[in-house]
Swiss-Prot record:
Entry-linked HAMAP family: AroQ (MF_00169)
Active site residues according to the UniProt entry: 24 (proton acceptor), 101 (proton donor)
Family to which the UniProt record says this protein belongs: Belongs to the type-II 3-dehydroquinase family.
GO biological process, one term: quinate catabolic process
Organism: Aspergillus oryzae (strain ATCC 42149 / RIB 40)
Superkingdom per UniProt: Eukaryota
Gene3D superfamilies the UniProt entry points to: Dehydroquinase, class II
Binding site for substrate: 75, 81, 88, 102-103, 112
MF terms in GO: 3-dehydroquinate dehydratase activity
Pathway: Aromatic compound metabolism; 3,4-dihydroxybenzoate biosynthesis; 3,4-dihydroxybenzoate from 3-dehydroquinate: step 1/2
EC number: 4.2.1.10
Known function: Is involved in the catabolism of quinate. Allows the utilization of quinate as carbon source via the beta-ketoadipate pathway.
Protein name: Catabolic 3-dehydroquinase
Short name of any one Pfam family annotated for the protein: DHquinase_II
Length: 153
């Protein structure tokens, strides 16, 4: 059975394609989600997408994933720099995750340089534009262990 991946996008990522295209590009979130699902399928994996501008809703979705997905790809948006709650949810469900940022947050304002997630992430993808989603999905599909593989250990 193929791996199951949850792709989470945080606040304002619903504006991809129109918000600051000089930073984030012109590809929409719907385009990112469709191409990510197609890429996952080409690798024998399934991918579910979720986007919310609300911290608690993201926490709820992460908790609902416990025991149901093999890996999470998360672009926490601005919550990267503020959300202990999302960090705790990710750690609490014990699902490996990739932290993803479309822009190079380290080349931007100093307050964007700190992440509450990076030290717990299995990997971090920064500054590759929306291509980073393809890289993240492929990494999870190819390199993460499935729930079945973990159970056999």
């Amino acid at each position: 059975m193929g791996k199951s991946i949850l792709l989470i996008n945080g606040p304002n990522l619903n504006l991809l394609g129109t918000r600051e295209p000089h930073i984030y590009g012109s590809t929409t979130l719907a385009d990112v989600e469709a191409s990510s699902k197609a890429h996952a399928a080409s690798l024998g994996a399934t991918l579910e997408t979720y986007q919310s501008n609300h911290e608690g809703a993201i926490v709820d979705r992460i908790q609902a994933a416990r025991g149901n997905v093999d890996g999470i790809v998360i672009n926490p948006g601005a919550y990267t720099h503020t959300s202990v709650a999302i960090r705790d949810a990710l750690v609490g469900v014990d699902i490996p995750f990739i932290e993803l940022h479309v822009s190079n947050v380290h080349a931007r304002e100093p307050w964007r340089h700190h992440s509450y997630f990076s030290d717990k992430a299995a990997g971090i993808i920064v500054g590759l534009g929306v291509y980073g989603y393809k890289v993240a999905v492929e990494h999870v599909a190819v390199n993460f262990k499935s729930r079945e593989e973990k159970a056999a250990l």
